[in-house]
Amino acid sequence: MKTTFLDFEQQIAELESKIEELRFVQDESSVDISDEIKMLAEKSLQLTKDVYANLTPWQVSQVARHPQRPYTLDYVGALFTDFHELHGDRTFADDQSIIGGLARFENQPCMVIGHQKGRDTKERALRNFGMSRPEGYRKAMRLMRLAEKFGIPVFTFVDTPGAFPGIDAEERNQSEAIGRNLYVQAELEVPIIATIIGEGGSGGALAIAMGDAVLMLQNSTYSVISPEGCASILWKTADKASEAAEQLGLTAQRLKALGLIDKIVAEPIGGAHRDYDGMMSNMRKALAESLKTFDGMKVDALLDRRHERLMSYGKFKEITAKS
């Protein structure tokens, strides 16, 4: 698959294009230019390292949305075995923007749930671009309850711009569906390991992300609103999205510093979309380490730990103004 380069990667794109041209010439000619190709490849690699070591929050947002980034089904196919997808919320419909089912991770039975955006136009329409309706969240809740009944851990993968804001979703009580999921996750008697793999957009993300362990990919985002949405509200124009991204504190590094997530999962150089195998290797290790934390933990201890974790969010200190 040919890599799609973002606006801030144009220098990298030019180098990669030159390398491809030279490789074509090498194949069609008896002249050995392998040394020049190697030199350009090393230059491209170093430039990529330099660019990705200094990404702004807005650039991180762009990487998080990259169309070639691994989605939930990519992780399911690479990390889990015996996946059996389960459909429907048993109330209204089967929302294809959230997929889920029984599987095995490292030979241990588990439940996997995650957003799926879609690769092409047809699939994106089917998946509603990863924006879930109430039936999607109710399906996720049903699968969580099923995992609880079987006594198996839940893995969730979050990648959504946010819950679908359409009239039909509101008519079927979108806010109640999200709120009910938060309630269920707070009391679920099995471990929940949530990973933000791309966009973590507001309540639409939180509805399947209240984990006992919350992981974030290095170039993913997690925020109450998108930078464009924030800019449109504060400055009445989406042109201020870059400034909004700075103020939202939506990067993994910022959220880790605030104690809102537990672990940052490193991405390969140039982002997860540049090296699927490397990303899957890093993810497997991170999930295995997180799951091991809860080995043998009794239900009461698990729930106490989760409660303490949730109550630790949003603490503040009052300071009396000097007269």
Curated annotation (Swiss-Prot):
GO terms for cellular component: acetyl-CoA carboxylase complex. GO terms for biological process: fatty acid biosynthetic process; malonyl-CoA biosynthetic process. Keywords: ATP-binding, Cytoplasm, Fatty acid biosynthesis, Fatty acid metabolism, Lipid biosynthesis, Lipid metabolism, Nucleotide-binding, Transferase. Its EC number is 2.1.3.15. The keyword Transferase applies. Coiled coil: none annotated. HAMAP family: AcetylCoA_CT_alpha (MF_00823). Belongs to the AccA family. This is Acetyl-coenzyme A carboxylase carboxyl transferase subunit alpha. It comes from Polynucleobacter necessarius subsp. necessarius (strain STIR1).
